[in-house]
Each structure stands twice: as structure tokens, then as C-alpha cells.
């Protein structure tokens, strides 16, 4: 998993305090081992930051829709459900009753069901293999 978030650094040499910098986060997958979370500070959001950090990485990379991750060779991008849900929620008109015929509302409700299912599975099982098996059983139904 990868994500980047803006931040301001005060008293950084040769940069104004209002200048936007970025903290990049890289997290290992849920493969049964202990999670590894690494952070990288950068003055920019350039996709080369991800390329440099993930040099030699091959596999699935869960991230948001930022195009900078497209530069990472040998990475198969996967979307983050929380980001997709946020995009759908942003597309729903505010201050009005939900229109259940709208794709954005239907998508948000479907993702809510996925999140609920994941909570149920994780409350019952703690090992990666058991969680994976339960997910696959639910998928086949």
C-alpha cells in the first residue's frame, strides 16, 4: 500500500513555511507477517518519489488514483476501497435525500456492505489464512 499526504515544514532551509511538502507512506501487505510501515519525506509529490522508494518492487500496489504511481514499473495497481467510497460520497448531492437509483449511491452502499463483511470476518478470525479463506467463501456465494 502507498499513499502520500501534504504537510508543512517550519524552518526548512531555503523554503517558505507555507510551502507544501509531502510525507509518503508505504505499508507491507497482509500476508500473515507483522506489518512494516515506512515513511519518506519529500519536498514534492512527483511520481519519481514512488519509483525511487519502490525500486525493485514487483507485485500489487494498493493506492489512490494519483497518476504518479503509474510510473512504478512491475507494480500492478489496485484501488483502495476507502478512496473509491470517498469519491462516490463526494459525487452524492449534499443536503438532499439519497436517490437510490444513482450509481454513486448504489456504489457507496455496496462498499458499505463490503466494509461490514470485512469487519465481521476480522472479528471472527485473526490469522491471514483464515481471513483469506473466509473472504473466498463469501465471494463464491
What kind of region is each of these model predictions?
Residues 1-141:
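Catalytic center-proximal scaffold of phosphoryl-transfer enzymes
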Amino acid at each position: 500500500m502507498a499513499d502520500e499526504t501534504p504537510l508543512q515544514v517550519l524552518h526548512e532551509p531555503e523554503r517558505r513555511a507555507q510551502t507544501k511538502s509531502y510525507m509518503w507512506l508505504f505499508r507491507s501487505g497482509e500476508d500473515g507477517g507483522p506489518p512494516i510501515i515506512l515513511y519518506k519525506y519529500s519536498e514534492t509529490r512527483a511520481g519519481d518519489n514512488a519509483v525511487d522508494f519502490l525500486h525493485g518492487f514487483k507485485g500489487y500496489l494498493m493506492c489512490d488514483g494519483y497518476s504518479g504511481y503509474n510510473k512504478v514499473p512491475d507494480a500492478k495497481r489496485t484501488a483502495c476501497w476507502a478512496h473509491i467510497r470517498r469519491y462516490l460520497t463526494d459525487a452524492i448531492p449534499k443536503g438532499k435525500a439519497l436517490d437510490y437509483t444513482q450509481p454513486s449511491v448504489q456504489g457507496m452502499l455496496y462498499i458499505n456492505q463490503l466494509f461490514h463483511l470485512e469487519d465481521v470476518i476480522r472479528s471472527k478470525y485473526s490469522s491471514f489464512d483464515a481471513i483469506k479463506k473466509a473472504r473466498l467463501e463469501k465471494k463464491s456465494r
